[in-house]
Each structure stands twice: as structure tokens, then as C-alpha cells.
Regions:
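Low-complexity, Ser/Thr/Pro/Gly-rich disordered linker/stalk regions
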Residues: 1-73, 158, 206-218
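Short, exposed beta-strand/loop patches in secreted or surface proteins that constitute
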Residues: 40-46, 110-113, 179
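Secretory/extracellular carbohydrate-interaction modules
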Residues: 54-125
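Beta-strand-rich interaction surfaces with strong enrichment in secreted/lumenal proteins
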Residues: 60-67, 135-142, 188
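Short tryptophan-centered beta-strand motifs in secreted/extracellular beta-sheet-rich domains
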Residues: 75-77, 145-159, 165-167
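Short, aromatic/His-centered strand-loop micro-motif at the edge of beta-sheets
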Residues: 126-149
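Surface-exposed loop/edge segments in extracytoplasmic proteins
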Residues: 130-133, 172-177
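Flexible glycan-contacting loops in extracellular carbohydrate-active proteins
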Residues: 174-200
Length: 218
């Protein structure tokens, strides 16, 4: 069980691993505010200026070092975005590093909240090259500067050799199955493409596999 509040003095940053994207040659720390953490940006930038001119400069990510495994895994984070996008929960099966020894995402999933919906991006890494595609999505309006709890459930489907991901946020719920979904992984949060605030993070595991029939599958 992981249960972290990101308010000032309520958590220990040294218990988390700072991660970078292979698309950028930097690794930023989050900035501590009274009630949350936020990815770094120049306060002189307006939201519109940040999005138009500095979107590649504000990436920050961290992962909890406790590996999650079980027939069912629940991960959630309370988050908000100031403008258009794009706070997310990240799931990575390994604690990979780049060629300089810095923690960096290779194969992983991103579950993203933004003003027009929810996206699940699947990243792969082969031959030294990072690539990605949109694995699942839902379109719905989400408001800036409003707190949302983004929930991700990963469940092993009984009788099948694969996992199902279910995403829920703001009354929107969807899911999908994919043989590439990991049965065990590390989880964390990423702020990017705008000012993103994170208020808490939770994760828990269980041993009950998903019964497709009981879940409405026919």
C-alpha cells in the first residue's frame, strides 16, 4: 500500500526516483507548493506562452520504487492542469536508465488527463529508438484548475494470459486489454506540456483475478 500526500512537509522526495524522458536531455525536480507539487516553469510565462513556446522545457517525472504486482493493482492520483494539459500517471515495468546512467523511461504506459479527454499512450523501445502509439482514449471535457482523481486499475483476466486496464476520471470510464500490459510494474506521476499540479498518490494490490462475465463481458 502506498499513500502519499504531496503537501509541504507531508512526504519525503528522497523516497522517489526522478525520471526523465528519452525525448529530452534533462531531468527536472518538481517544485513544492503548500498543498501540492508542480512541474517547474518560469513564473513570467503566461499559460499561453508556455504552451506555444516552452512546452518541451517543463517535463518532470518521478516514480515510486516499490514494484506493484498482483492479480489486481489500483493506482490513483489527484491532479489538476492550469491551462490545457497534461498531467499523467506513468506505469513502467522496469527502472531503466539512459546512456548517462539517469533513470529514463523506455517501455512504459502513460495515462493522461487533458482538457478534451483521457489518453493511454503505449511507449516501446527497440534498437535504441523510442516509439509510441495511442492505445486507448475517451473524449470528454475536463476543466482547468479543477482537481480530478485519475484512477487506473490493472487486473488479470481469469482464464486468459493478459491484463485489462480500466481508467476512470470525472465520471468517465473506459478500458482495454492488451497482451503487452505488464503484470507487475512501478508507478508514478509526470507533469508536462503545461503547469500540472499533483496533490496525492495511492497504490494498492490484491489477489482476486477479474471474472469477465461478472464484469459485464458477454
Amino acid at each position: 500500500m502506498i499513500d502519499v500526500c504531496f503537501a509541504r512537509g507531508r512526504w519525503n522526495p528522497s523516497e522517489w526516483l526522478k525520471f526523465k524522458s528519452l525525448r529530452f536531455d534533462y531531468a527536472h525536480d518538481f517544485v513544492q507548493l503548500d498543498d501540492c507539487i508542480v512541474n517547474p516553469s518560469d513564473p513570467k510565462w503566461s499559460d499561453e506562452e508556455l504552451y506555444a513556446q516552452h512546452v518541451t522545457e517543463v517535463y518532470a517525472s518521478m516514480v515510486h520504487p516499490q514494484k506493484l504486482s498482483g492479480s489486481t493493482i489500483d493506482v490513483s492520483a489527484t491532479m489538476s492542469f492550469d491551462h490545457l494539459m497534461a498531467p499523467l500517471i506513468v506505469l513502467t515495468p522496469e527502472l531503466d536508465v539512459d546512456d548517462k546512467g539517469r533513470h529514463a523511461f523506455k517501455k512504459h504506459y502513460e495515462v493522461v488527463l487533458y482538457n478534451e479527454g483521457l489518453n493511454v499512450w503505449h511507449y516501446t523501445y527497440e534498437g535504441g529508438k523510442l516509439s509510441w502509439h495511442l492505445a486507448a482514449f475517451a473524449r470528454a471535457p475536463f476543466e482547468p484548475k479543477r482537481k480530478y482523481e485519475l484512477k487506473v486499475n490493472m487486473a488479470k483476466v481469469a482464464g486468459r494470459d493478459e491484463m485489462r486496464m480500466t481508467v476512470e476520471c470525472g465520471g468517465v470510464k473506459f478500458g482495454f486489454e492488451d497482451p503487452d500490459l505488464p503484470e507487475s510494474f512501478y508507478a508514478g506521476v509526470t507533469g508536462c506540456e503545461g503547469r500540472n499540479r499533483f496533490y496525492d498518490f495511492k497504490a494498492r494490490t490484491g489477489d482476486r483475478a477479474l471474472d469477465p462475465a461478472a464484469d459485464g463481458e458477454h
